[in-house]
Amino acid sequence: IFFLFVSSIIFSNTTGELKLCAIRVSFPLEDDESTTGNGQFLKIANGINCLKYTIDPPPHNRSYFESQIKAVSSYFDSVSYGAFKVDLENSDIFPFGEDNSYELDSSMASYNPYGQSSQSEGKITRLFQDAIVLAHSEDGIDFSEYDLIVVFHAGIGQDFSLPFLDPTPQDIPSTYIDRDMIKENIEGGSLVINGYEILHGIILPETQNHLLYEISNDMFSSASSPCDYQYGLTGTFALMIGFAIGLPPLWNIETGKSGVGIFGLMDQGSNNGRGIIPAPPTAWSRVYAGWEEPVDITFNTNIELPSRYKNNIAKVKINDSEYFLIENRDNSIIENISIDSLQYIMWKESGEDSITPFINILFDSS
């Protein structure tokens, strides 16, 4: 479950290539029990050792974030059938040094004060502003050359409901910073750097994997399979870009009630496959983005809908203003063998009470 601060959506171009300006910011070296890590980007893991696999392993340096951007670009290139992706050649990650970052003056906790929800949007918008101002002052970045600014900060995102009391409530939530947040929380109502007005952007953590940090030894001490709590950053990253290019959220942002659930990127589907294999946007979202065109069908018509082929979306009108969109979703790993069927077979053969973890299915089927 994500805890996001979202208001208006700025429409952007959902086709073509998106030029990203990624900024890495850290915090003063600290030992604050209310936040994860020490304010700096991870160089080595010091948490629970998941021998078989580690999601988003350190060092979290410039090369690591290049990989994150490549991953999210590949995701959008795939789900849009080549209509939209990141412009990898003209996107940049600052600072240019492999292990460098811009160190802010304020602590991590100061940007998400505990028990002060009324100040949350203002504090997080200030983080966005502070990061941009600092990066420009040190490297003179021309932000007009980019379509979207992404601020990667040291530490974990305050984005998931954990099955126990969260010991680090002042971690910073991943956030799409929209025009309204800037207008309401920045002096003068705008963010202008060297004559260029920045209208929106994204705030993301360096990772979503708690198990890379020492605190995980206490957090997951009672978990029988703590490594199953690893999550990748790709799903969160894709969700935030979805907001930035104008894809509407498909859950109730006032109450948090899910709409399409795990079946679409713009709801809980961003966390599918431990956050490393997010669900594609729903058929409606893909049509809305201009990536696909539905085929109108009438009742008593036989149709074939191959899984994951462009424009294989059936549109069935209910009345003048409502319709169903139908597509074929298939989670087969190889022909005629799905993740669900493998999970069932492995559970039956193991004789154990619990279902085989999803990640084990992927390993055993590779």
Each language-model region and where it sits:
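Active-site-proximal segments of metallohydrolase catalytic domains
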Residues: 63-211
